[in-house]
């Protein structure tokens, strides 16, 4: 079966069980799939995980500047609940660049904006990116040289600012770990060196997710 037709859990289980990767895994469909009751993922560049709570939605990552709007549209087709909290897993633009679309959605609805939470290293990363704006655009175009500007991945000449002007700055940061409660849901944020040195992984201890 074509991987585009597989449920994300089915696709990941297939790879884990077989140990064989023979089809695309990191899909950019802009489509939302409910993983469990109240838990969903929008597969994009990058993905956005969404958890429903009694106080609103908790979103993990905002996707990129070219895909954030599509992510919000898919989210809104699934739920009209306000976004309570937006967590950045790290400061790369494909994970934070779509935050402007989330705040535009809030403005249209006339509700309070979400709280943005991230590791403390995200703020100096943004500052560094802004100071080296032209350089970052150049090296990313070289690194991803096979991607044409019209592919709209934010890596070509169509982008004026490496950090989009409407990117939301973190409202709350942490250093090693942070316990967060939204509604009746508990979220444990932990710092780890992953793709970056400002990486966060999120754990729901009650549901082991």
Regions found by a protein language model. Name each.
Residues 58-61, 85-87, 189:
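Short catalytic-loop micro-motif centered on adjacent basic/acidic residues
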Residues 1-29:
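N-terminal pre-domain segments of enzymes
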Residues 190-199:
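Active-site glycine- and acidic-residue-rich loops that bind
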Residues 42, 54, 98-99, 126-131:
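Short, solvent-exposed loop/turn and secondary-structure capping segments
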Residues 91-97, 123-125, 196-197:
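Active-site environment of divalent metal-dependent phosphoester hydrolases
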Residues 124-191, 206:
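Metallo-beta-lactamase
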Residues 25, 32, 55, 66-117, ...:
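Active-site metal-binding motif and surrounding structural segment of the metallo-beta-lactamase
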Residues 26-80, 201-209:
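Conserved beta-strand hairpin/beta-sheet module of binuclear metal-dependent hydrolase folds
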């Amino acid at each position: 079966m074509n991987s585009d037709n597989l449920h994300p859990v089915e696709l990941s289980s297939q790879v884990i069980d077989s140990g064989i990767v023979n089809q695309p895994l990191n899909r950019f469909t802009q489509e939302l799939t409910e993983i469990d009751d109240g838990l969903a993922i929008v597969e994009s560049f990058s993905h956005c995980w969404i958890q429903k709570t009694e106080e609103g939605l908790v979103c993990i990552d905002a996707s990129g500047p070219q895909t954030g709007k599509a992510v919000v549209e898919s989210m809104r087709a699934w739920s009209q609940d306000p976004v309570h909290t937006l967590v950045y897993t790290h400061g790369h633009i494909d994970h934070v660049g779509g935050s402007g679309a989330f705040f535009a959605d809030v403005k249209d609805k006339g509700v309070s904006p979400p709280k943005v939470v991230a590791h403390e290293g995200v703020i100096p990363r943004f500052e560094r990116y802004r100071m080296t704006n032209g350089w970052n655009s150049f090296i990313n175009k070289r690194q991803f040289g096979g991607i044409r500007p019209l592919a709209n991945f934010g890596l070509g000449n169509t982008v004026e600012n490496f950090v989009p002007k409407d990117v939301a700055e973190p409202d709350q940061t942490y250093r090693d770990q942070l316990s967060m409660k939204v509604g009746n849901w508990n979220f444990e944020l932990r710092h780890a060196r992953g793709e970056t040195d400002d990486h966060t992984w999120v754990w729901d201890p009650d549901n082991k997710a």
